[in-house]
C-alpha cells in the first residue's frame, strides 16, 4: 500500500486529524486522539466512546496507547521512499513524523498530493523559486491547451496553474500569470488539490430532547444551526458536533452540504433487503425495493422513532446500533418538521394544497386485510377548503364506452348547509351533450380524476412481474396509482405491501370517486347489474311547478320540476315530470345555492353512475309523493298527481331528531310506469345525502328498493334476486338495529345518538313481493304547522298500513351507502369500519411517502393498529391516509 494512502487511514474518527503516538485506545478497542477524548470529558463530565457509546471508567491519561498504531508510525518514519513518476527534481527524502505534531519535516513533490489530510508541507517555504510551485492549490499542465471557447484558460505543457474552484468533475477554474479561465481536468495533474469544505449540515427544524437523562446521546439544536458531521450512525441517524458537544441527530432534520453528503453516503450501512410493507425511507425505497422484492428487512430498523427499551442499548455494536432505540415513549419534538420535499419526489403527489387528498378528495376507501374478501366500506369524509372539480379531458379512458347509465347526485355547499339537487340528463341535454357512458359491471369503470391526483385501484386479475420494476398483482389487492403512462402501464404502490412499481393498467379497475363541488359532496349509487334493461336518469329543470313560500326563519324551498329521461334497451319511454322539493337551511345563502346548482349542471357529465338489476314484482302499485317539512316550521303539502299506472311506485321518507331543525326531503313521484325513487337522508352535521337505487320499472318488472316481504310466496329466482339486491343496496334489513357511529366522526353513515329521539316512519319504500303492502312516512312536527294529511289519507286508500311493524317508534338504521364505484364481481357488501380519534401530541416528520406528516394538535382517525406499534389512519386536516408511530398520538 502506498505510504500516503496508509497515512490517510490513520486519522481520528472524531476530528479527522492524523493520529499520532499520543492516541489512546478505549476498552472497546476504538482509538481516538487524546485531544478529542479530553474535549469529551471536559464537555460531558464523563467519557463514552463516540463510536459505540460504551462508558469508560478510567481517565484519559490512564488509557493505554495503541501499540499497532505506534509501530505503524515508526515504520513510516524510518522507511525511506522513492519519488513517484510525478515527482519533480528527482530528489529523495524521508517522510518523518513528529511524535506530537504529526507534521511533515521533509517532503518531495509527491507529498504535496497527499498533504490535504492535515499535514503542512514546510518544504514549500524553503523551495527555490525556480520550481514555481505556489503554496496555493495548484496543478501542473501535462499538455498544451489552446482553449476552444471564450473564457477558456490557455496554457502550455509544464505550466503551474493556480486552482480557484472546481466547476464539476471534468472542469476547473484556474489562473495562469494573472489570466483566469476554465480548463479540462484531464489536461493537468493536480499537485495540491483544493481544500475540501468541512462536512457540515444546516438544521431545518428544532430538535429538542425533553428527557436529557434518558436521551443524553442526542444532540439538540435549533433551526438554522450549523453542525459538523462526523459520521453516519445508521439509516436514519448521524453523529455530529455542535460547539463542544457531540451527539446523534436525525438525518431528516438537517440539510447536508456536498462534503457531508459524500460522508453520509460513504458511511451508509449495507441493506440486505427491504420489506416495503414496513415503509422504508424514500432513499432506500427507490433503490432497494425493486432489487430485493422478496427479501426481508429487520423490522426493528424500521424507523427512527419506534420506541424500544433502553436495555437493548448495551448489547448493540457500532454497526448494529438501531436508530429507534431511544427510549419509550418517544420524546423528540420539532418546531414544524415537514417532509414535503421527499413526498413531492413522486410524480403526482402534491403536498402544497391542504385540500388535495392523498387517496380521495372526499374521503378514504377503507380496505380490508389481504386475506379477507374485498369490500368497499363506508367512506370517511373530511371538510375541504378548496373545491375540487374533476376535469373531463384529463383522464385516459381505458376502454370504449358500454351502455349508458346514470345516477342522481346530491350536492352540498361548503358552509355545511344541505341542498338536495337532482342532477343528470336534462343538464347534459341543455349543454348539448349526451349522458356520460360508463363501463359495465364486469368491465373497468370509467372514472374522472386528473392524472396529477393519486387514485385507488383494485386488481381484477392476478399478474406475475417479469421485470424488477414491476409489481405483482393479486386479485382484490388495492393500489394507489401515481402516474398513468401513455403505453397503458400504471405507476403506483400497493396499499398492502407499500411496494412501488409499474403494472399493466388493464389488470386493475378504479375504486376512488369523482366529486362534485366540495369534499362534502356525496354521490350515492347502486351496484352495477344488467345495464341493458334501462336506467332512469333524473336531472334538474327550470320548468314551472308549485313553489313553496319562505317560512319560519326564511327557509326557501323552490321545488324544481324534474323531467325523467329513461334510457332503455327496447320500449321504455320518457316519463312526465316529477316533483322534487329542494330545502335549504337558513345557513345557506342564495349565492351558495346558485353555486351548488351550477356545479351540478356543469359537471353532470362527470358523475360516476351504475345500474341495478331490475327485479320482477307482482301487483306493484304507485305511491303518491310524500310531503316535505321542516321541524318547528309549517309544512307545505303538495297536491297528489293522478295514479299513472300499476307499475310505478314512489317513496316517502322522513327523518326527524329532537331539538335539531333539519331539512326533511322526500322522494319524487313520477307519473309514468318508469320512475326512480330517491331517498334523501339528512345527517346530524347538516349534510344531505341522496340514495338512489335507480330501479327502472315496467308492467312486467318493477323494482323493490328495500324492505321485508309480509305477504305472498315469491318464486326462488325472485327471492334470490331480491335478497342479493337488498344486500347490495342496504346491507341489512329494515329490522336491523341502528348502528351507533363513533362520536364526532364525519362518516357517510347517519349517526344515531343513544339518547336521541328514534326515527319515526319508514326509512325507504317497501314493496313486498306478491302483495300490495306499502308504507308511508311523514315528517313529524312539534305542532307548529299542519301536517299534510292528504298524502297519508290517499296512501292509506291505496294500501293498508302494516300492523305490528316497525312503523311507530322503533328506530330503524338507514341502509349503509355504497361507495361511488361499482366493483362488480369483487364487491360484496359494505362493511363498517370502527375508527378511533387520536390527537397528535408530538410533531412527526414523515420518512417516506407512505407516512403521514403529523403536527402537534392534529386529529387523526385511526382504523388499524399494527403489532409493531405503528398505526394506519387518516389525517383530518387534509384527508391523507398513511402510517405513523403510535407513540406520537393519544386517544381522545
Curated annotation (Swiss-Prot):
This is E3 ubiquitin-protein ligase SH3RF1. Residues 274-323, 532-555, 688-751 are annotated as: Disordered. Residues 713-724 have a biased composition (Basic and acidic residues). InterPro entries: Endophilin_SH3RF (IPR050384), SH3-like_dom_sf (IPR036028), SH3_domain (IPR001452), SH3RF1/SH3RF3_SH3_4 (IPR035816), SH3RF1_SH3_2 (IPR035795), Znf_RING (IPR001841), Znf_RING/FYVE/PHD (IPR013083), Znf_RING_CS (IPR017907). It is an enzyme of class 2 (transferase). A zinc finger (RING-type) spans 12-53. Has E3 ubiquitin-protein ligase activity. In the absence of an external substrate, it can catalyze self-ubiquitination. Stimulates ubiquitination of potassium channel KCNJ1, enhancing its dynamin-dependent and clathrin-independent endocytosis. Acts as a scaffold protein that coordinates with MAPK8IP1/JIP1 in organizing different components of the JNK pathway, including RAC1 or RAC2, MAP3K11/MLK3 or MAP3K7/TAK1, MAP2K7/MKK7, MAPK8/JNK1 and/or MAPK9/JNK2 into a functional multiprotein complex to ensure the effective activation of the JNK signaling pathway. Its EC number is 2.3.2.27. One of its GO terms (biological process) is regulation of CD4-positive, alpha-beta T cell differentiation. It comes from the Eukaryota. Residues 701-712 have a biased composition (Low complexity). PANTHER family: CAP, ISOFORM AC, SH3 DOMAIN-CONTAINING. The lineage of its organism: Eukaryota, Metazoa, Chordata, Craniata, Vertebrata. It is found in: Cytoplasm, Perinuclear region; Cell projection, Lamellipodium; Golgi apparatus, trans-Golgi network. The gene is Sh3rf1.
